[in-house]
Curated annotation (Swiss-Prot):
One GO CC term on file: membrane
Induction details: Expressed in the late phase of the viral replicative cycle.
Biased composition (Pro residues): 35-47
Residue ranges crossing the lipid bilayer per the database entry: 5-25
Similarity-based family: Belongs to the asfivirus CP123L family.
Region span, Disordered: 33-54
Coiled coil: none
Principal subcellular localisation of the protein: host cell
Name used for this protein in its record: Uncharacterized protein CP123L
Keywords: Host membrane, Late protein, Membrane, Transmembrane, Transmembrane helix, Virion
Membrane-topology annotation of the record: Single-pass membrane protein
């Protein structure tokens, strides 16, 4: 039986031959002997997003002409109603609120105020 040193040398030679064979097949795959295939190019950056244009969007939508004409006015009215509701909520008397909203799921006046403000932040 061969010694351990001989086995190590044989194993090293076989390993080197395997690596050389692998390198040979890699270069033949590239159809140019001795040259490795070119590296993969970096990914191209995504195209820049177009800035949102509300007027262009409104032209493309299939809304009724009255809606297209009045949507800004209605949005301003809704914003005014919301802001006046916030002011009204801040000035509302706590006892009157609790008397009117008993059993509606509000724990306290502050709880209702915080829920309403969370709703306004979302929308």
């Amino acid at each position: 039986m061969p010694s351990t040193g001989t086995l190590v040398i044989i194993f090293a030679i076989v390993l080197i031959l395997c690596i050389m064979l692998l390198f040979f097949y890699k270069t033949v795959e590239a159809e140019k002997p001795g040259v490795l295939p070119p590296p993969i190019p970096p990914p191209t950056p995504p195209p820049s997003k177009k800035k949102y244009d509300h007027n262009e969007y409104m032209e493309k939508t299939d809304l009724e002409p009255e809606v297209k004409k009045n949507h800004r006015k209605w949005a301003n009215e809704a914003e005014h109603l919301i802001s006046s509701s916030v002011k009204g909520l801040e000035n509302l008397d706590e006892t009157a609120f609790l008397a009117n909203h008993k059993g509606h799921g509000f724990r306290t006046f502050e709880h209702a105020k915080s829920l309403f403000k969370e709703f306004l932040k979302k929308y």
